[in-house]
Amino acid sequence: MIALSRPSRRAAAVGAFTVSAALGAALLVTSPFTATAAGPGELRIHDIQGNTRVSPHVGEQVTDVAGIVTGVRAYGSRGFWIQDPRPDDDPATSEGIFVFTNAAPAVAVGDAVTVSGTVTEYYYGGAARGDTSLTQISRPTVSVVSSGNELPAPVVLDADAIPAAYAPEGDPADGGSIEKLPLQPEKYALDLYASLEGMNVRIEDAAITGPSTAYYELWVTLQPEVNATSRGGTRYASYDDPNPGRLKVESLVPVAQQPFPTANTGDTLGGATEGPLDYDEFGGYLLAARELGTVVPGGTEPETTRAQDRKELAVAAYNVENLNPSNDQAKFDRLAAGVVHHLASPDIVALEEIQDDSGPVDDGTVTADVTLTRFTDAIVAAGGPRYAWRGIDPEDGRDGGQPGGNIRNVFLFNPDRVSFTDRPGGDATTATSVVKQRGKAALTHSPGRVDPANPAWDSSRKPLAGEFSFRGTPVIVIANHFNSKGGDQSLYSRYQPPTRSSEVQRLAQAESVNAFVRDILRVQKNAQVVVLGDINDFEFSATTDALTAGGVLRSAVFSLPADERYTYIFNGNAQVLDQTLVSPGIKKFDYDIVHINSEFADQASDHDPQIIRFKP
């Protein structure tokens, strides 16, 4: 997957404000609104929120809406939350709402206030992106009635509180949208969260399923027994089962005052975490913690796979996340340690996201010899073999990824264990094909690109095919990095089920690779072919179905227990993005996903490597 960059939502808060641990003191800063004494108006928060995702009062001016301040955010989307301490009897109508001030608010937690302003529905990234909107009061005038009030009791969210069903089907008459459907919080998890939008909620002793990040956030699950991984995470098992208990957690306290904790998958966010329930641009529903629990280590450690024996060929794949010469040496060393110590120095390593020698500088450079020399030197320094490499430089700016980086697939191989069969003529635009030589399938160009002129590979990495020989037996390896999921609607989308628009291109890519493997097997029925890399799609996806169509390939991930099937964690969901597939000529194999990155806050890459061992 291609990582998306974003500014730190808390950067403005670092060292900028003085806030008590409970945010109990008023922020003494300039604000566009004034604080004066006033009484409540007739319209209540639950009236504004209504029983759907869109306020029945959107666009209207509201006057003297009363509530108790339950949280203050002085960074990012600045404002505060208020909650009516006198709820109605409708569980579908939230009693809380966010007041967007666009400046550090001059209110404190526990203040009783009245707010006048405009009711708006804010769509992060714009309405066209498909996300659910956040109901808020904008351009406010705020009056403080009293201070030091008791907060409304939090709604406790636990395993029993979360419905098993994730979301309703969208309304066909509304383009598949759910935003105008009446909320059913007792039936659907997304409806439950929507019905609590802006309200004070509490979780206790929550299992951490997504490690803390540079953006001061982590993911927990309120249902740790649902789709549990073997190492304390939550596995994305199917499109119909996206794990409704997942919740993102951030802190409202600036990190300069209270550093955000470091957490790994398998840890626990111990004690109570409490604050308003928000909707986040980068991950759905979010507990904006006024009170943050303590991380209790779970003891998760990076895995190590076994070494191959003398007669086994070990082939690995590793997405090294935009590796380039501008990276510090520590990244090269950590990735090298992963290859040597955690993967036990495989015979062949298919690398994804090797950048060119100028990295993200867009200067026309396409060679990657400097990048690969530094990496292979680091492997030797870590005690590994002196790997040789093969690859094909891409056309400048034609293969997607980070602008200027020209990422590509590359083979490393240990010449003391395996030989590479070089057949010249392969370049960025020339397709390799299959011929018969001495009764065996052979590539016309090795290394060579698979079907590079096919529009399926536009702005995407072209597959790299190479022919190897191990103990006299030829093996064809195809390294892949399919297009990313960028542009897909999120699991929290107001369109349910969400549209996976990026899948169209991956399907075409899978069909292209499948057709190439068919060509190999037509020439040699028992040819030994390994297709591997960052497929950017799940084991239950249509992409995997297209790769394996006709029985020409089978995905090795299914040889693992279900609770071990993941190479990447996104929004707290452990999932398969990287796969290894083999042709029928490889009858027995030993496959492993080596969890050394995805579960940890301190990562060498955002993907876990995978390895397959077999006897050709």
Tell me what each language-model feature is:
Residues M1-A37:
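Secretory targeting and sorting signals
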Residues R6, A25, V29-T30, A35, ...:
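Generic detector of low-complexity/intrinsically disordered segments
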Residues S31-F33, I137, I208, F420-T421, ...:
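A broad structural signal for short, well-ordered beta-strand segments within beta-sheet-rich domains
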Residues A38-Y318, N322-S345, T429-S433, R438-K462, ...:
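Extended non-catalytic accessory segments flanking core domains
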Residues L286-P616:
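Divalent cation-coordinating acidic motifs and surrounding scaffolds
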